[in-house]
Amino acid sequence: MFAILLISQMKTFTLKSELKSYLNGIRKDKIVSFIPTMGSLHEGHLSLLQKAKESSDVIVCSIFVNPTQFNNPSDLEKYPRTTEIDINILTEKKCTILYLPEVSDLYQENEQVKQFDFDGLDNFMEGEGRKGHFNGVATIVEKLFRIISPEKAFFGEKDLQQLQIIKYISKQLQIPIEIIGIPTKREESGLAMSSRNKLLSETGIQKATLIYQTLKYIKENSDNFTVDQLKKIAIEKFSHQTDVNLEYLEIVSLEKLQPISEFKDANENAACIAASISSVRLIDNIIF
């Protein structure tokens, strides 16, 4: 039976040295879980927190908008930041520890992003269109893992490619952390919860529902069409929408994230979409 460590108030740290020292003092015989975020928290993040509570004594959340994973400076600048609101949410939800660092606490001046071999997991989709993105993600995740040394780390399946890459590098780097993926939290319309949704207009939110509708169509019709036929039908759905720009639509193997020509067994396939709604870039996927 797990009981979240009782503290009078959530502890907040801005320096990794102080965070490590505090964790070293409380972690004996305790399960420490970690949830990395870039802030602008929503119910999707909170579902990770809720799941972590079921098997943890200490929960560490981080809020850090990692500059090295943005290959578009304007995207970094526009990324929504709601730090005070986020702190209040985490306090209310009884997060144990918040790590809220500045860039200088995690990166040295002029530090080069580490280059990883992802064994082809980054060849398509996000890796193809956002060069260097996953090296930036893996760099910061490795840093955070080594600072916090959790037993478990929780990630949303909405960022499926990121999740699979983090699982892979954790094994390659021999970091003994259980990586746990949590199903995507959705609005009633099916739209995947995302911090970027805050940048959408009401009309944009309505148009964005096409993404999940298309993914669901692919899943429900995988017994009726070939992969190529389904891709063609699905892509056609986007051609009739104004202000909706389909960046990619791929049907891939869940394990390797490589495009497939024939469907695999149940729960070994994934359909993945990236699309911009009036310049707001959204991603989503469905596993089937």
Where are these regions (language model features)?
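Nucleotidyltransferase catalytic core that binds NTPs
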Residues: 2-243, 256, 279, 286
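Active-site-adjacent helical/loop segments in soluble small-molecule enzymes
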Residues: 243-251
